[in-house]
Structures are given as C-alpha cells and as structure tokens.
C-alpha cells in the first residue's frame, strides 16, 4: 500500500498511516516501520528514497566506513532515515537543517553529502570541495519551469568527484526501490 500525501484536511494522517500493516507498508509510513530503521530491526520496509541513496552508494562502490557524511534535511521522509542508514554503514553522520550555524563549512568537511533540503539550488559551490560524493534528493521546478534539485548542479558538478543529476538520479532509483518493495511484499504474502 502506498499512501499519497497530503491527505484531505478532514482526515487524520497519523491515524491512517498507522492503520497500515507493516508487511504492506512499502514506503515506511507507519511508526512501527520507521522504528525498524532506527532500531535496525527488520520491521516492514525502509523508506524508498533513503534506500535509493544507499543503493546508489553501493552501486558505485562507495564504502561509507569511517567516512564523514552530512545529511542536509531532517525530515522523517528522507533526512533522519538516511542518516540512520549511513550510521548502519559505519559513517560518522552530521544532520544539518535550517538552524545549523555555518552550514557550508560543515558540509565542506564531509566525504558524502545527501541533500534533502526541499529548496531549489540551496547547496552551491561554497558547500563542497574536491573528492566529495553528492546525492541530490531534491525535486523542484525552477523559474524556467524545468525540474531541478536542491543542489546548484552547474556550480557544484565541476568541483566534486560525483553527483547525482535531477532529473534522472535518485528519483529513478527510488521508483525501482518501490517496485522491489511491492514485489517483495507480494512474495512474502504468497510464501506465508
């Protein structure tokens, strides 16, 4: 089951989300499924977008062990789960948000940056240095009506070692992860 949000105002989102059985919660919307991300227990499924970020790192052979990672964004949809998944991969993680003091210098210290800020082009060249891997989760529409990420791709791409594009980056992998979760949920039901 995939619940599209926001729900109409007369519905209680928390009640509806938590009515889902974890085995059908393919995008980690219930509190119980989310607890699995934070405890390391296999309850339900992890959220698709943070898992997509981890799969991108795995696909390109980026070992997180001992690396400094910065997650820009602290939502329960991407930021916090991504941070926990990076910790599970033995990275040292800092979560940045709107109240982080001197965020560009914090980000420059990282080896890996996951950006889920929710604002177009918020991360520019002053946030990065050579050798970094940048995963841009953002999906925005710029003034020209084109899709763009939370990272100023044109300014950042020449500096860093690797960066995901928007469109065609994390979103595509997220869709693949979601399909995988749906298939796995069906297989679990059939084999139960």
Question: Which residue stretches match the model-derived regions?
Answer:
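Anion-binding alpha/beta catalytic cores of soluble intermediary-metabolism enzymes, centered on
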Residues: 2-64
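Rossmann-fold NAD(P)-binding glycine/threonine-rich loop
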Residues: 12-38, 131, 135-191
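Glycine-rich phosphate/diphosphate-binding loop of Rossmann-like nucleotide-binding domains
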Residues: 35, 41-133, 142, 146-157
């Amino acid at each position: 089951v995939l619940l599209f949000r926001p729900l109409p105002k007369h519905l209680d989102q928390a009640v509806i989300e938590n009515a889902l059985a974890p085995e059908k919660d393919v995008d980690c919307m219930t509190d119980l499924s989310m607890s699995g991300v934070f405890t390391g227990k296999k309850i339900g499924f992890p959220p698709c977008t943070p898992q997509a970020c981890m799969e991108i790192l795995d696909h390109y052979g980026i070992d997180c062990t001992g690396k400094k990672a910065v997650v820009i964004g602290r939502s329960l949809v991407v930021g916090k789960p991504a941070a926990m998944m990076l910790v599970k991969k033995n990275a040292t993680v800092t979560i940045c948000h709107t109240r982080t003091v001197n965020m560009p210098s914090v980000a420059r210290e990282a080896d890996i940056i996951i950006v889920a800020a929710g604002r177009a082009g918020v991360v520019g060249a002053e946030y990065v240095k050579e050798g970094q891997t940048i995963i841009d989760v953002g999906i925005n529409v710029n003034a020209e009506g084109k899709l763009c990420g939370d990272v100023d791709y044109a300014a950042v791409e020449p500096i860093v070692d690797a960066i995901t594009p928007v469109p065609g980056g994390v979103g595509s992998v997220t869709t693949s992860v979601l399909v995988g979760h749906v298939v796995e949920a069906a297989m679990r039901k059939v084999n139960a």
